[in-house]
């Protein structure tokens, strides 16, 4: 095993993983919101006049950016990231997958584009966002559990 990796404290490795995943989720979140605006459906204020679930989904950045800031300042913030990931997953799944009257079903992500390539790219962004949120939740949960076991 790499001696530098062995010497690095465990919390520092958790912090770096959470920071990387936080950046990943933020980038894919921005790409997904841009996709909503470009598609012109399931968008909302500030890009259209009406306030919609899209408008409220923009508040996720009020959770993501402080997490990134805390990580950059040297804090692990695992509980924060676990909360953010679970909120993000609940939001994304409820909007895209739950119920017959969901806000933005998958067919509206893919089928709106004239080109299958653009539709597929929009799906890749959505799947990347969901996988990033799952990875963030799992990593944050493991970091929380590791810190709990370390205290005993």
Question: Which functions belong to the PLM regions below?
Answer:
Residues 1-25, 145-147:
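Cytosolic juxtamembrane helix and N-cap/initiation of the first transmembrane helix
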Residues 18-28, 56, 82-88, 122-129:
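Hydrophobic alpha-helical transmembrane segments of polytopic
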Residues 21-52:
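Hydrophobic transmembrane helix segments
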Residues 26-36, 87-104:
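C-terminal TM-helix exit segments that contain a strictly Trp-centered aromatic cap at the helix terminus
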Residues 40-49, 95-122:
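Interfacial non-cytosolic loop connecting adjacent transmembrane helices
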Residues 56-67, 122-139:
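Hydrophobic cores of alpha-helical transmembrane segments in multi-pass inner/ER membrane proteins
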Residues 68-98:
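Loop-to-transmembrane helix junctions at the membrane interface
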Residues 136-152:
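Cytosolic juxtamembrane helix at the C-terminal end of the final transmembrane segment
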């Amino acid at each position: 095993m790499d001696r530098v990796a062995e010497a690095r404290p465990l919390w520092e490795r958790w912090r770096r993983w959470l920071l990387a995943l936080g950046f990943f989720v933020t980038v894919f979140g921005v790409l997904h919101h841009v996709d909503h605006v470009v598609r012109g459906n399931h968008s909302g204020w500030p890009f259209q006049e009406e306030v919609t679930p899209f408008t409220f989904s923009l508040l996720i950045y009020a959770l993501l950016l402080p997490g990134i800031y805390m990580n950059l300042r040297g804090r692990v913030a695992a509980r924060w990231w676990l909360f953010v990931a679970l909120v993000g997953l609940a939001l994304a799944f409820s909007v895209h997958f739950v119920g017959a009257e969901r806000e933005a079903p998958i067919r509206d992500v893919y089928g709106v584009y004239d080109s299958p390539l653009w539709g597929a790219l929009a799906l890749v962004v959505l799947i990347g966002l969901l996988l990033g949120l799952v990875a963030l939740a799992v990593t944050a949960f493991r970091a929380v559990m590791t810190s709990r076991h370390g205290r005993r």
